[in-house]
Curated annotation (Swiss-Prot):
Statement: the UniProt record of this protein carries the keyword Nucleotide-binding: yes
Similarity remark: Belongs to the class-I aminoacyl-tRNA synthetase family. TyrS type 4 subfamily.
Organism: Nanoarchaeum equitans (strain Kin4-M)
Name the UniProt record assigns to this protein: Tyrosine--tRNA ligase
Positions bound to L-tyrosine: Y37, Y170, Q174, D177, Q192
Gene designation: tyrS
Length: 376
């Protein structure tokens, strides 16, 4: 595989941004091995954004001959009060349900779970000892309190929101994870951009400059026209601060279960959630149902998109997402017909994950998490 092919794999959807493409090319031309990581907070059930979108990108990295790592951030989750703020529970879920869910998701999208390294944060810190603390101090000495405060959006917190002092540690800890793992390719959703920019800015203290790759954040099913217009205005005026604050409200979130598709949802759950989802007729930008076709269904199935009109029983076939968008923008497709297609294809794609967690070996991990959520 040549350099151009590797770059194309890294840059293709769901990638939205590479910081920077020139540095990526330089590293590849120099024959530098790329060491990747993506970090995850440990909370509730894994949805399409966490499982499928993230793992689609990990799959691409694997194809591009990048060493991939999934980092289970138990201390970060504790700081951010996930799973009731119980560290023991967080670790149990991390090593059980969460690790399994990510591996199953990677396999579902065509990646190789046997070729990905899974690292628990606390185990890394125990191994590194004082070195990890030194990394945090180095980072803190090379950035400002104002930058750290602005970076709290990586935790799903809005700027100006009241936070604990521990939560201020979150950003330098995340940056320290990158250097502590010897990562030169940091990966995350576009909401993680601020931490990765700080990592690049403090790179002189560590002797090398990492690349950052940011993937698309999947919209939640609950977006409405008011939120949509706010986001469109932020994009139009290139107001990154407003956009990043708004993304917290509209991205698919496990804390709002009716707005998220989980990887082990039943067919009935998927159909119900898709049926209720926001899908404005003729609008293709910031439309969560269109996004599911563009970022989940088409990249995985790689097959023509066939939409059936339920009234006339006539079908329309599209070779790619752009053709579908064009027809939808012209109001040639009814939202209900598009929703029907999306629901059935998601049911098909998620069948392996659903069987693993509802009927197979993964059921014990799913039930364990359910019980922990009830008793905590």
């Amino acid at each position: 595989m040549d350099i151009e092919e590797r770059i194309n794999l890294i840059a293709q959807k769901p990638t939205e941004e590479i910081l920077t493409i020139d540095r990526l090319k330089q590293y590849l031309e120099q024959g530098i091995d790329l060491n990747h990581y993506i970090g995850f907070e440990i909370s509730g059930f894994v949805h399409l954004g966490t499982g499928i979108i993230s793992m689609l990108k990990v799959r691409d990295f694997q194809k591009a001959k990048v060493k991939t790592t999934l980092f289970l951030a138990d201390y970060h989750s504790w700081i951010n009060k996930k799973l009731g703020g119980d560290l023991e529970t967080i670790r149990k879920v991390a090593k059980g349900y969460f690790a399994e869910a990510l591996k199953v998701s990677l396999k579902t999208v065509g990646g190789d779970p046997d070729e990905v390294k899974v690292v628990l944060g606390s185990e890394l810190y125990e191994k590194l000892g004082i070195e990890y603390l030194e990394n945090i101090i180095k980072i803190s000495m090379n950035t400002t309190l104002n930058r750290i405060k602005k970076g709290i959006t990586i935790m799903g917190r809005k700027q100006g929101e009241s936070i604990s002092f521990a939560q201020l540690l979150y950003v330098p800890m995340q940056v320290a994870d990158i250097y502590s793992l010897n990562v030169n390719l940091a990966h995350g959703g576009i909401d993680q951009r601020k931490a990765h920019v700080i990592a690049i800015e403090v790179s002189d203290a560590f002797g090398y400059k990492p690349i950052a790759v940011h993937h698309h954040l999947l919209l939640g099913m609950h977006i409405d026209e008011n939120i949509r217009q706010k986001l469109l205005e932020a994009k139009k005026t290139n107001n990154r601060e407003l956009f990043e604050d708004s993304v917290i409200d509209i991205k698919m979130s496990k804390s709002k279960p009716e707005t998220a598709i989980f990887i082990h949802d039943t067919p009935e759950d998927i159909r119900r959630k898709i049926r209720k989802a926001y899908c404005p007729i003729g609008e293709i930008e910031l439309n969560p149902i269109i996004e599911l076709v563009e970022y989940v269904i088409y990249p995985i199935l790689k097959e023509p998109i066939v939409i059936e009109n339920k009234k006339t029983h006539q079908t329309m076939e599209f070779d790619n997402v752009e053709q579908l968008k064009e027809a939808y923008a012209k109001k040639q497709i009814h939202p209900l017909d598009l929703k029907e297609y999306v629901a059935e294809k998601l049911i098909e794609i998620l069948e392996p994950a659903r069987k693993y967690f509802l009927e197979g070996k993964g059921n014990k991990y799913l039930e364990e998490l359910k019980n922990l959520q009830i008793t905590r």
